Amino acid sequence: MDTELLKTFLEVSRTRHFGRAAESLYLTQSAVSFRIRQLENQLGVNLFTRHRNNIRLTAAGEKLLPYAETLMSTWQAARKEVAHTSRHNEFSIGASASLWECMLNQWLGRLYKNQDAHTGLQFEARIAQRQSLVKQLHERQLDLLITTEAPKMDEFSSQLLGYFTLALYTSAPSKLKGDLNYLRLEWGPDFQQHEAGLIGADEVPILTTSSAELAQQQIATLNGCTWLPVSWARKKGGLHTVVDSTTLSRPLYAIWLQNSDKNALIRDLLKINVLDEVY
C-alpha cells in the first residue's frame, strides 16, 4: 500500500476538509480527492461521507483510522532508523568559501590522514553563508560549523580554535589605500564593524565576494586590495601588504548542537589542529 494514500487519509480525517488537507500537504484539492478514491478502491469501501462541506468518516473509515496511524508511525520510525544507519559514517562540516580555501581545506586533509582505515568517516565539505549554515545546524542538517563569530544561542556548544591574522593585500609593492579599489571579502558580520575604520567610511567596494581565491585573482585586474589571511597570502606569493594599513586578528570557532549524538566524535576531530598556526 502507498503510504502517501494513508497520509492523505489521515490529513482529511483530521481537517474534515479536502481544501485544508490539500494546503497542509502542498497538493491540489483534486489530487487529494484522487488519492482518497484510490485508497477506497483498494479497500473496496467508502471512507468518508460527503455532503456539501460536511465530511465525516464512515464506519469503515473509523475502523481504518487507528491502523493508519499505527502504520504511518511505524513507517516514520523505520525511515528514521534506516536513515540513521546510512548516515552513521557521514559527517558534514560547513563554512564559508574563504575559510575552506584559506585554512579548512588543509584541515580536511589532516582529518583523512588521521582516520582509521576500517572506521573512516565520509566527510561532506559544505560551503554556504554563515546564516544559512546556522539554520542547517539548528535543524540537524549539519554536524559542525566553523565560523569567525559564535552564534548566541543556548542550544549550541562552541570551542575557540585559535586566531588568524588578516592583512590588506594588493598585487604590487609600495601601494597606498587611496591608490587602490577596495574588494570586500566577507569575514563575518562583526568584521564589517571594523571595516569602515580600517578602509574608510566612504569607500564603496568595487567587488564583494565570499571567495578568497576569486578576490586574490581579481586584485591585479581591478587595481584592488582586499583582506586576506597572512599565512595563506604568504604561501600564495605575489601579494604585498598595503603600506598605510594595519593587521587584524580574527577568532575561529567550532559550533555544534549541545545535544548532538556526535558530541564525542566532534571533540575528537577538533583535537586535530584546524589552524596551521594556533596562538
Swiss-Prot record:
Keyword Cell membrane annotated: no
Domain annotation HTH lysR-type: ranges: 1-58
GO BP terms in the entry: negative regulation of DNA-templated transcription
Similarity comment: family membership: Belongs to the LysR transcriptional regulatory family.
The UniProt record lists the keyword Cell wall biogenesis/degradation: no
Superkingdom per UniProt: Bacteria
One Pfam entry name: HTH_1
Keywords: DNA-binding, Repressor, Transcription, Transcription regulation
GO molecular function, one term: DNA binding
Gene behind the chain: hdfR
Gene3D superfamilies from the UniProt entry: Periplasmic binding protein-like II, Winged helix-like DNA-binding domain superfamily/Winged helix DNA-binding domain
InterPro entries from the UniProt entry: LTTR, LysR_subst-bd, Tscrpt_reg_HTH_HdfR, Tscrpt_reg_HTH_LysR, WH-like_DNA-bd_sf, WH_DNA-bd_sf
Residue ranges of DNA binding: 18-37
The protein, known as: HTH-type transcriptional regulator HdfR
Function: Negatively regulates the transcription of the flagellar master operon flhDC by binding to the upstream region of the operon.
